[in-house]
Amino acid sequence: MTTASIAPERADTVGLAGQGLMHTTLTRLLAGTCSVLPLDLSLNPPSDGAAAHAGLDACGGAVLAGDGWDPDLHRAFNAECLARALPWLLVYVERGHAVIGPCTLPGQAGCSLCAQTRRNAARFDAQELSQLAERFATEFAAPSGSWLTTCGAELVAALVADELGCLTSRPHQARTRNAVVRVDLAELVVSVHPFLPDPWCAACGDLPDDTEQSAWIVTRPAPKASLAGYRVRPLSGAQDRDRLLTRYVDAQVGIIPSLTKNGDSMFPGARAPIGLRHSFHQSNGSGRTLTVQAAEITAITEAMERYGGLAPCGKRTVVRASYAQLGDKALDPTTLGLHSETQHALPGFRYQRYHPDLTLSWVWGYSFARQRPLLVPERYAYYGLRHREPAGRAFVSENSNGCALGGCLEEAILYGLLEVAERDAFLMTWYARLPVPRVEVASLRGRTAALIIERIEHTTGYTIHIFDTTMEQRIPCVWVMAVDEQDRPDQPKVMCAAGAHLDPERALEGALLELARQLQYATRGYRDDRDRILAMVADPRKVRVMADHAPLYYAPEVFDRLLFLVDTPRQQTFDEAFHGRPGPNADLSTDLHETIGRYLDTGLDVIVVDQTGPEHALEQFACVKVIVPGAVPMVFGYDHRRIHGLDRLYHVGYELGYHPRPLIHAELNPHPHPFP
């Protein structure tokens, strides 16, 4: 793409619109460097609400400058300039800061509307600010009084003049290309804040339609960075962290507004919040590893995984129909595990009944069993859409099950499938009350996991229990449990976590680090929430959200629900539990196809929805949602559990030798699960 700049034949003429001290100062300063053409900002209201700006056609570029914040005016001016392929620069004042930029260049993504969208998503108080701006729109747009002094206006005007010079003759040096410059009007400190263009931008975005052709997946060789690893390019060092920080993290307009470290816990941790465009919902990426840098990188990459899974960011959904209309072009939603009629009859149940004539939006995925593209319900593939649309439009409760980010498509699919395996194994064990083997902690001697356990037990006084929950696909899965065997007052009785990986040691390490994260906060949470927890013990319907499930089992009153595991008669060493594992492959694609084959061999399909957006591709990431119809989905909230129609719950325990016969529905575990 060529670098756009102010049109050279009109470069000496800059259209200047606006009012107030900022506008007056800029008019005077620019008069000595170029021809300034005053622009009329009076509204000549057309049907689309855009402003009519006389003289724009005679300019090589334009500036809109004012002493307040008027997003409606900014949006209208942006539309007028884009319609004329006219470069322009925004200058305004908001709450103690002057903001310069972004410069909007014709034919290039990244405009003032993109910047505002990123800004809104980055703010933790976006909802409150939106309400204030709506109620006090006139006050927000008015001059900012004492915040903008003559000295401050002179500084900002000088920065604007220099920026216009860059846009005229050296656009590659412009500081406001996909960035905003903020000037603290109290301290006169200048900072630059880069942002990524919004592919969904109504003004400059150009998302392609989601098509059947684009959904085809042809796996390619993916050489591993090391034979013992499972990544094509592991991210772990300071250089990787700094690059990701620069790309994604900015307090003002970043996809990730902050990255915080937690250094007061057993193991390094980090947190990266992320907002959803056109919504006030925020999610979080978190990292819990053995080094600070790795924890920060994990938090950033998990946040970017959330970004891809919450809502489409790479393709525009175009298919809307019923399953009855689509037939074999679509996934049968009844294979995903639905809510039962009993659940639908509950007062206020938020999900609608599914039936084949229900009209849904669909996105294209790829079925490895059918070896062709397959339509998947959009609300199943993107779990954040519930925050932008009424919940009643969804027919199931779904979350980040099977979502993963990878250094290539093959890596992302593998890790998405491993998450499906982890959660399916945990819930199969829970609902079918499988007395899976205990893994002897003493048999871990010499492994990293043994050191993690030693630190947890020494620091907290809890005893760690490990169980092998590997299911019929033979993917190593573990359930770990921290039990307060001393029955200390005000201490949570038990906490659980899970892990899955082709390398069982990594599965165990990941589960233990997740357990350590819980232990850090559990004691205080138990003391503060004791009454609420006891209410959930008495009434499982009070277990409503993810944050309720683990605390329920802090209560010693319900420890007996876990005795089917704690009292299991089966016991193995770590090597006995995971012997016979295939040797390492040099190519990750080989690992992926072997893993997919294990599901296909047990009658389960593997479906992949590519969620990769332009923001992921900038760092050569791939983002996916892996769906395995028939696997038990992790759902939070007792009323939302989804086990209706999942036949594996009844017979897999029998086939694996844990039960003498297949179960019937009345024998399934009726209690809320303890997954964190």
Listing of model-derived features with the role each one plays in the protein:
Residues 1-264, 275, 289-292, 297, ...:
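Adenine nucleotide-associated cytosolic modules
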Residues 176-676:
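Helix-biased "structured C-terminal domain" signature
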